[in-house]
């Protein structure tokens, strides 16, 4: 399930666009996640009160959390699949503290791909989308494996 060097290059090139505005991209990803899958909002006590897209866009806390999420993911993607330590740490917090099901990682992966394509259509074509999809699937599979080790049925 690994990615070729060329696929990793596509992933990292696309991620370079994210790094120009991590917080803005992160906020858009979370808005897409929460509006597309409102049940995910229930896992975030800090954001449960945000009912509309306008409220979400106005939330500095949501923007900060989006920055945190995409900064962590960027660090993982840059490891090109050699992310065992990072995934272990992330899985521990997401299983034990936050109780985030693997399905929600699928939802946010879809949101990331949607936002990247919407914001950067000329730099995020079918090849880049496919590579990013594979990279995010690798991440999710490794998170799921770590969840199993931790005994989390997420």
Curated annotation (Swiss-Prot):
Gene3D superfamilies: 6.10.140.2100, 6.10.140.2110. Keywords: Cytoplasm, Heme, Iron, Metal-binding, Muscle protein, Oxidoreductase, Oxygen transport, Phosphoprotein, Transport. O2 binds at residue 65. It catalyses: Fe(III)-heme b-[protein] + nitric oxide + H2O = Fe(II)-heme b-[protein] + nitrite + 2 H(+); H2O2 + AH2 = A + 2 H2O. GO terms for biological process: removal of superoxide radicals. Residues 2-148 form the Globin domain. One of its GO terms (molecular function) is oxygen binding. Its main location: cytoplasm. Its EC number is 1.7.-.-, 1.11.1.-. The modification Phosphothreonine is found at residue 68. The keyword Ubl conjugation does not apply. It is found in: Cytoplasm, Sarcoplasm. GO terms for cellular component: extracellular exosome; sarcoplasm. Pfam families: Globin. The keyword Secreted does not apply. Heme b binds at residue 94. The modification Phosphoserine is found at residue 4. Nitrite binds at residue 65. Belongs to the globin family. Monomeric. Monomeric heme protein which primary function is to store oxygen and facilitate its diffusion within muscle tissues. Reversibly binds oxygen through a pentacoordinated heme iron and enables its timely and efficient release as needed during periods of heightened demand. Depending on the oxidative conditions of tissues and cells, and in addition to its ability to bind oxygen, it also has a nitrite reductase activity whereby it regulates the production of bioactive nitric oxide. This is Myoglobin. It comes from Cervus elaphus (Red deer).
